[in-house]
Amino acid sequence: FSEEGELALCLEKRGEAPDEYSGISDFVIDGENIIILDRNQQKTITYDHSGNSISTFHLKYYAQAISPIVNNTFFLYNGFDTSHKLHRIKNWKEDSAFLEVDKNQTGYLFIFAHHNFYQDHDSIYFFQPINDTIYKSVEGGNMNPFLHIDFKGKNIPTSFFSDKKYENVKDFFDNLNKRSYAYGIYSFIRDKRFTMFGSFYQKNKKLTLFDHKNKSSNTFGTIKDDVYFKGLTIPISQFIYHANKDGSIVVPLEAYSVVEWRNTYTPSEPFGSIINTTKEDDNPLLLIFDFKQ
């Protein structure tokens, strides 16, 4: 869809043929091209905006996320499938690998996330659910440590990973939730004024907003809507957002939630006409906004 809500393309190429995908693990739009990552078939497929297949790039590992493309370069995140977590693809050739995998963690730290990459102009940021460090690549260069998140002494200590051998993801989180550790970096976004990301503390999802100008940060568990439904409070656990490279943020609102909310809260203008005609089985409404600078 365009940002005006107009349908741009409906792509349906599911299958096992060379120009088909078994599922969409991730995708990225690069100008006139749409690049789809098919984890199960270990490949990426590039289509044009008419849905025609342009090329297929085969992988030797199971990748779960693809980064935006900068300078004909992108990164693939494969979790713990190879000796390194990140692979750099430059001009459609394997170029380098980054972030060596700790073999002691391969059995329990393979965790999926909505996002692992964020683009800000010519920079690509990489982040993971169980990692306090955010990495950065500029103009397709090496992926280097950029930020370390300090959860005010609540970070998971290194000893937590080394002192006990966990059987699986459930065993790891059962032990983690017995302690008051903060962890995760979800949906990281950064512009000239703010850095924002999600995390977990005591089983609850939180959102942190850091103001570069004032050198201050706030962490909160709810968002008060003063745009669509004034007075509506949304738990962070229900607040899923996607970051555009221009710094804007897209929040999908499920149609059934909008219908439920309008029975209690009066929709604000100029959104009232859209909200009042929304049906429960409609596509999600997309709220696009920018940070106040």
What are these regions (language model features)?
Residues S22-D26, Y61-I69, G107-N116, A182-S187, ...:
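Repeated scaffold domains used in trafficking and secretory/extracellular systems
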Residues Q42-I45, D81-R88, N131-K136, K203-L209, ...:
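Structural motif
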Residues N91-M143:
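Loop-centered beta-sheet repeat module
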Residues E12-D19, H58-A65, V101-T106, I149-N155, ...:
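Short coil/turn segments at the loop-to-beta-strand junctions that recur within blades
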Residues F1-E32:
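Blade-loop segments of beta-propeller domains
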Residues D19-I24, L37-H84, A97-L109:
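Asp-box/WD-like beta-propeller blade repeats and closely related beta-sheet repeat scaffolds
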Residues F146-F173, N177, K213-K245, V259:
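Conserved blade-ending motifs and adjacent loop-strand segments that build the rim/top face
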Residues I29-D38, N71-G79, K85, N116-Y135, ...:
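Short beta-strand elements that form the blades of beta-propeller/WD-repeat-like
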